[in-house]
């Protein structure tokens, strides 16, 4: 998976610096 370490809720499809959102979870991607 491109995502790891689920965090607080977020908007699906939202992305920013080394982060992504999937299934309402904010995830941190490996740099």
From Swiss-Prot:
Record-level Gene Ontology MF annotations: toxin activity
Tissue specificity remark: Expressed by the venom duct.
Modified residues (4-hydroxyproline): 6, 31
Post-translational changes noted in the entry: Contains 4 disulfide bonds.
Example of a GO cellular component annotation carried by this entry: extracellular region
Highest rank taxon of the organism: Eukaryota
Keywords recorded for this protein, A-Z: Disulfide bond, Hydroxylation, Neurotoxin, Secreted, Toxin
Intracellular or extracellular location(s): Secreted
Domain text: The cysteine framework is C-C-C-CC-C.
Protein name: Conotoxin Cltx-2
């Amino acid at each position: 998976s491109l995502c790891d370490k689920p965090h607080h809720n977020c908007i699906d499809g939202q992305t920013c610096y080394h982060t992504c959102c999937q299934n309402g979870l904010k995830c941190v991607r490996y740099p």
